Every structure is written in structure tokens, then in C-alpha cells.
């Protein structure tokens, strides 16, 4: 396999990213494209966010999201969150997932992050081994998730 080009996504990558995210979360309700384009613009323009992509022959085939979060503890060192790791189904098992995650982590370390966090809802031990091969440990922290309460319809509506 030819080694991919690893870089930050651009506005021109929106459609390719949406196709990958459909593989990651097939049941997601699609948001209006204009809204998603505005979100990607915000990410692209920020120094604290990045959508990392791997491209082969110009096609986006893998991605992950990096969020560098300012912090008032740990001597002011920021920390990072890595999310939305997905490799196109035709390219899984080729090292592209590890490549985008390691690229994101390298950026986090260059930005002075003292740790990077990642959560997965997948229970498959192979997926856990994948994240461990990228440098993550499941033994250091316990993760919790809160979701907003269900929306209650207004009276008469």
C-alpha cells in the first residue's frame, strides 16, 4: 500500500468526511449541509481543533478529530480529546487508523498537552487493542458520559 498523505482537513473535504462519518454512525440523522459546513469552517480556522485526514491518491480514506482544551491545572498544560476515528471500510486493517490517531497525538504533544483522552462505545476487544496500539491505556482513568435529558414536548405541542 502507498503511504497516505496525513494532514488537516480543508473545507473541500466536507463531503468525503460526511461519507466516512456515515460509516462510523450509520443511524445518525443528517444535519443540514450548511450547518455542517459552518462547523467545519470553525474547526479549520481554529488552533484548538483539527480534523485529521489520511488521503490516498487524493481521496480521504481515514479521519479523526483532535480537540486541544486549555486548562488551568497541571501548570496550565492543555489536554486533548481524540474522537470520531473512522477508516473507510475498503481500507480497514491497513494501518490508516493508527496513522491518523498517531498524527493527532503528535500534534497534541507538540502543543504541550499533558494527556490525550479517547472514548469508545465499542466493546470489541480488537478495537480496544487497536487503541492501545496507538498509545492509549484503558487502565488509567474511568470515563463517564452524561447526555441531555429527553426533550419534553411543550403543552399542546
Regions of interest found by a model, annotated:
Residues 4-17, 30:
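A short beta-loop-alpha structural element at the N-terminal edge
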Residues 18-41:
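Conserved GNAT-fold acetyl-CoA-binding loop/helix
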Residues 41-53, 81:
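A short helix-loop-beta-strand connector motif used in the catalytic cores of GNAT acetyltransferases and
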Residues 53, 59-68, 81, 86:
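Conserved beta-strand in the GNAT
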Residues 71-82, 92:
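A conserved beta-turn-beta hairpin within the catalytic core of GNAT-like acetyltransferases
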Residues 87, 93-106, 132-133:
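Conserved acetyl-CoA-binding loop-helix of GNAT-fold acetyltransferases
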Residues 101, 108-120:
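Conserved GNAT acetyl-CoA-binding A-motif
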Residues 117-127, 145, 149:
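Conserved beta-strand-loop-alpha-helix junction that forms the acyl-donor binding cleft
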Amino acid at each position: 500500500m502507498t503511504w497516505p498523505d496525513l494532514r488537516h482537513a480543508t473545507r473541500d473535504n466536507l463531503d468525503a468526511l460526511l461519507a466516512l462519518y456515515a460509516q462510523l454512525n450509520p443511524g445518525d440523522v443528517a444535519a443540514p449541509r450548511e450547518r455542517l459546513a459552518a462547523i467545519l469552517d470553525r474547526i479549520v480556522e481554529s488552533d484548538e481543533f483539527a480534523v485529521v485526514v489520511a488521503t490516498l491518491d487524493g481521496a480521504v480514506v481515514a479521519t479523526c478529530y483532535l480537540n486541544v482544551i486549555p486548562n488551568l491545572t497541571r501548570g496550565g498544560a492543555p489536554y486533548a480529546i481524540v474522537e470520531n476515528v473512522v477508516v473507510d471500510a475498503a481500507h480497514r486493517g491497513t494501518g490508516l487508523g493508527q496513522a491518523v490517531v498517531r498524527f493527532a497525538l503528535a500534534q497534541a504533544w507538540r502543543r504541550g498537552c499533558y494527556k490525550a483522552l479517547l472514548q469508545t462505545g465499542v466493546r470489541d476487544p480488537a478495537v480496544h487493542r487497536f487503541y492501545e496500539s496507538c498509545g492509549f491505556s484503558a487502565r488509567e482513568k474511568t470515563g463517564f458520559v452524561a447526555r441531555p435529558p429527553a426533550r419534553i414536548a411543550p403543552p399542546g405541542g
